[in-house]
Each structure stands twice: as C-alpha cells, then as structure tokens.
C-alpha cells in the first residue's frame, strides 16, 4: 500500500507487519523531503513513526481520541490522516499547520504548541466520555521532556486517583526535549529506559507458574496474587513512581518495534483504569545527521538532504537578537559572578547556550518549568544574585501569577528577556509573541522596555541589571538591523526616557521596539507626499516618557502609535491612557495587531496581512487623517517593507 493512498488511519487495520514497516519508510521519506525543502520540526516526528502506526493499528479513529503533546511529534499523524497531498505546504500561509489544529482536521482532537497539556486534555475527554455514557478510548502521547512540566505531573496525580477511568498515557521517551532534559525525573526515566519491560516480567512469571505440574494450566487466585508481588518486586527498578501514583505501568519497550508495540497497546486497552506505556524511541530515527545531532535537528530551516547542511541565505544577515543577547550576557557574567542566566529548556532558542558553554556555573536550565523558573529567580534575587530569565514571550504567559505574586509585588531585581516578542511566523498562533506588552504593563513595580536595534539591546540589558527592581526587555525573532556593536562599556539608559529620531510638524509617530525602523521608513514615505513627521523611539513602555510625548502631541495635534503586539492593552493603549489622565485630547491612531489570531505564514506575510508594512501604514495614516492619497503612487509602488 502506498502512503499517498492512505486517507484514513483505520486503513492501517489488517495490514501485515511488513506492510506497516513499508508505510513507516514512506512516512520518513515524505517527512524528510518536505522539511528539507520548507523547514519545520524534523527530529521529533522521525522518532515516532512506528509508535504512531502501532498505536493507530489498535484504535478506531472514527471514535477513539488521541491527543499529541506540543505537536512537534505529530507530522506522521498528519501524513496518515488525510494530509499527504497538501503536506508540501507545511507551515506556509494557507497550508498545513506545523502544530495540531482542531479546525484543520477532525483527527486533531486538541490544538497545542506549548508543552505538557496532553494528559490534562485527554483526561478531560475521558471524563466527558464517561459522563455521557460512551465507550471510546482516550489517549495522550507525551514526550519525556514535556513530562517534566508541572502541568503534566498535576494531571498524572489526578488521573491516578481515578482507578475506574480507562485512560492511556503513552510516554515517548527519546531522552530529549528540544535540548537534553534536566532534573531528577529525567534521570529516573533514563534508568528506566535500560530496564527489562515490567509487563513481560509479570507475564513470564505467570507462564512459568502455569507450567508447574500441580497447577495444570489454571492459576488459583492466591497464586495470582503471588505473581503480582513478583511484579511489584521488579517495579522499584522501573515504574515505581507511576505505579505508586495509581497507573498500571508497562514498559519500557522498543519504540521502533511495531509488532511489540501493537501487543503492548492491545494489553493496555484491556486494563480498566489509567495505564502508562513507556516507549523508548530515538529522536531523528532514520536520518543519520538528525540522530547524531538531536538538538540541531529538532527543527530545521531548509537543508540539503545529502549533506544535512542548511541551505545558506542568498545574502548575509546580521546576527540575530538572540545571539547578540547571549554574547552580551556572557561578557557581563565574566565581569559579575552574581549574574545568573536561567532558561526553561530553551537554551539554544534564547541564546543562553553561549553562556552554558562559556560559564556553565552561571547558567541554570530548569526544564519545561516556566513557573518554577520565575520563582527560582525571585529566590535568587532575595539573597543578592542578579538572575536573567531568558524565555519566549509566548511561554512567559504560563508564569503570569509568579510575575505578579513572586516578583512584582516584592519588587525583586529579576531581569526577563522575552525572546520571539511580536510576530514569529510559521509557528502560528500558539507561538506569536503578541500579548506580552499587554500583560506586562499592568504588573506592579516592573520596568518594561524594547530596543530599536541590537546596539540598544546591549544598553538595555545593562540598564536592567543596574536597576533595583524587576525589568522586562522584549526582543523580536530574527536578525538585527546590522548596526555596529560594542564589545563592552555599554552605557545604561535613563529609565523612562525616549528619543526623537526625526523632526516634523504634521504628524507625531510614536514607535516601540521592533517597529521603530518601520516607523522611520513610514515617515520617509509620508515625506515624499509632503507630510513631515516627528518620529519618537519610545524605548520604555513602563514608565512612559510623558515629559517628551505630551508636549509634542499638544504641538503637532495628530498622533500615530506603532507596535508589534496586540492593540488591546498595548503600547498605543498606554499612550491614549496617559493622554486621558492629563485631559489631553489629541486624535490618536493606533497601529498594531488587532483582536485576532495571527495564523502561520512568513513574518513578512503576517505583517502584510495586518497592514504593518511601511507602505500600508503610510496609506492607512493618510486615509485616517484625511490627507489626499490619489497622487501618492509611491504608497502602492514602494518596495520598502519592515524587516
């Protein structure tokens, strides 16, 4: 059978093991071909090909429900649930999403882009099933990295208290998250990977007892209890934690042996309560480069399949904001041993891998544990350290209570560097960093800022570390502006002070962070239409530089705010509120992300769809303030676009 003919996972039923293994080869071939061309998550999906096939072989996917954690590992799922033909559009505008989306397929039962949610969601579905008197199976598939997340452990704690609720958790243990997992639980799982499978210990004991002459095939109840005791003697070396939490533990089993997994999943489905099947897989399985470098090939841009090397950009790009941050933090840490970098399993993505390599004793990876990362930093700050928590904007949402309760209220000097703030592109709505401006500006005692370029990022990092309270610094995804950088000697900025970049009399443009350069480009286009603009780099969201902004607004009389974040409660809202507080009635036009989700596309395509390119903003501004656009052909013909 060809993979291209597979439109429904139930078509796997009845195929021989040899046929299923052939399907597995075809999945890997298609997976590699598409990701090498358009980019995407590589290693996670390659590692669960056989697991997906074996699991679906034991389910009726017309009624049974499988929830995949995060979605990194769900590409094989997509390929056997009717998306083979469109898979070449992966992560492209209007194409197949990189994560699971309920709106994309009836087989995507729960959308996710953040880790550790699957067990809670699948358990909720099991609750609904039982309440409605239905009889289908509910399964969560979670990686060992995601299992270290507090939410997953909370769900296991709850599920284990429900002995009569049939519920299956499949632990995909590849000894990795995005980076190697950390912590005591990961160490425990690693030991379990190398232990004999528990259910087969128990089965072999029962088989041996059956063959005793005085038993004669049937095992009396008292002897059955003895075999259970033998199993419990083995469990402490393997699944003790899960057994003690109320789960029936099975495994570890080879996650690339389809036949054995089918038998194990079938046995798991026969158990009346919660079951955890521990499956040991290899991240990147079947592609030698991905197996050898499991961190580097977790996700890839387009690459050469033969060499495994990324296809170089047509033109050289400046270093990314993440890299500049990482390099600058290393320099600061070399001079101050009280500065500690903290990541929640995202060292490479945030640039903290540079600190990890250079000064490992000033680097902490807490695993997928954002809440713990924030309060750990708060504790450090209590006793004289200067922690720097580097975290994606979208993931800091998970620790909002800790920001308020543990850091803000106590005014502790913790620095947060929010990477991927703003539009992130192909990862879609679960990863867009569009909310941090709104959720940070209301937290007590915080100073919140964003740089216009990578040189200003360096100065802001120093500013944060010299401040005596909590600070948040947002940086966008991707390359910087290409400005000259200093190796050391960065001067801190004055808190709450912006700067004027352009002077004009017709319009005041207030821009924040990554939208400062597009604002300058927008002003240049307006200038060609005879409209002169004052452009202000706000620098600080909290406190806002009212001493600079208010007199300019009074004098000029027309204001535009530009931000790469949600308009609701955002930078523009802060400006309008400051005007209102001072009874300053000035027309203000806010440009940013409206009340909508930003779907997967390239960053440039997303900005175009939101009207946030300089030519689009120029046209919108002229229309808003009644300036004639009929002769402004430059607005539609201009090639100027935001970076």
Swiss-Prot record:
InterPro entries: Dxylulose-5-P_synthase (IPR005477), THDP-binding (IPR029061), Transketo_C/PFOR_II (IPR009014), Transketolase-like_Pyr-bd (IPR005475), Transketolase_BS (IPR020826), Transketolase_C (IPR033248), Transketolase_CS (IPR049557). It is an enzyme of class 2 (transferase). It catalyses: D-glyceraldehyde 3-phosphate + pyruvate + H(+) = 1-deoxy-D-xylulose 5-phosphate + CO2. Pfam families: DXP_synthase_N (PF13292), Transket_pyr (PF02779), Transketolase_C (PF02780). SMART domains: Transket_pyr. Pathway: Metabolic intermediate biosynthesis; 1-deoxy-D-xylulose 5-phosphate biosynthesis; 1-deoxy-D-xylulose 5-phosphate from D-glyceraldehyde 3-phosphate and pyruvate: step 1/1. PROSITE patterns: TRANSKETOLASE_1, TRANSKETOLASE_2. Binds 1 Mg(2+) ion per subunit. One of its GO terms (cellular component) is cytosol. One of its GO terms (molecular function) is 1-deoxy-D-xylulose-5-phosphate synthase activity. Mg(2+) binds at residues 144, 174. Thiamine diphosphate binds at residues 72, 113-115, 145-146, 174, 287, 370. It comes from the Bacteria. Its cofactor is Mg(2+); thiamine diphosphate. Transmembrane segments: none annotated. Its EC number is 2.2.1.7. GO terms for biological process: 1-deoxy-D-xylulose 5-phosphate biosynthetic process; isopentenyl diphosphate biosynthetic process, methylerythritol 4-phosphate pathway; terpenoid biosynthetic process; thiamine biosynthetic process. The keyword Cell wall biogenesis/degradation does not apply. Keywords: Isoprene biosynthesis, Magnesium, Metal-binding, Thiamine biosynthesis, Thiamine pyrophosphate, Transferase. Belongs to the transketolase family. DXPS subfamily. Catalyzes the acyloin condensation reaction between C atoms 2 and 3 of pyruvate and glyceraldehyde 3-phosphate to yield 1-deoxy-D-xylulose-5-phosphate (DXP). Homodimer. This is 1-deoxy-D-xylulose-5-phosphate synthase. The gene is dxs.
